[in-house]
Amino acid sequence: MRSFLFFLLILFALGATETFAQNGGKAEPLRIEFAKGKTSTVLTRSLSNDQQMQYIFGANKGQTVTIKNTKTSLFDFKVFSEESFPEGDFDSSPTYTFVIPETGDYYLFVRKKRVKAPRTASFSVTLTIK
């Protein structure tokens, strides 16, 4: 019976290790999809200090992107693309607008700032693409 339990333990450990390795130990970004006929969506989540949420969205060259952050004292954000924004910095602006330089996928990171209180808070970020 012990050897059977040991075998199950090893099998479970190998499966967990493989799953962890496939994802690189990191959660995949959430793909932002717009409802049909809509050009904006509101992203909401709760994060603790220094935690961040990663999203990905597609946009075409020439489209205008606007990001609205309602809680600039608690959250900041950055847009990242290896081709267009390789050195993106976190921004605490209430509104940030830019024109998409190249068609493709862009990452949007929302990060909870480190503050004494509240340690956990909910963000509401609006992403508009026109």
Language-model regions, residue ranges each:
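Residue-level marker of intrinsically disordered, low-complexity segments enriched
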Residues: 8, 28-30, 40-41, 77, ...
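N-terminal secretory signal peptides
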Residues: 22-66
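C-terminal edge strands of extracellular/lumenal beta-sandwich accessory domains
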Residues: 22-33, 55, 112-130
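Bacterial N-terminal signal peptides
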Residues: 7-15
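Bacterial N-terminal signal peptides that target proteins for export
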Residues: 1-7
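Acidic, Ser/Thr/Pro-rich low-complexity intrinsically disordered segments
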Residues: 47-113
